């Protein structure tokens, strides 16, 4: 898996225990959205 790919972002979010967002699976979102979601979750931690 390449750093910064959609699959990488999904895997990183799953490591943090996040599999869904607003009732949708992470795989259904675009890469830029997953990047922003991961960044916001890191800031909250």
UniProtKB/Swiss-Prot annotation:
Domain of life the protein comes from: Bacteria
Q: Which InterPro entries match?
A: DUF2639
The protein depicted here goes by the name Uncharacterized protein YflJ
| Species of origin | Bacillus subtilis (strain 168)
Q: Which gene underlies this protein?
A: yflJ
């Amino acid at each position: 898996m390449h750093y910064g790919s959609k699959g990488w972002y999904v895997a990183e979010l799953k490591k943090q225990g996040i599999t869904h967002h607003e009732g949708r699976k992470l795989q259904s979102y675009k890469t830029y959205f997953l990047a922003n979601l991961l960044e916001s979750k890191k800031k909250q931690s």
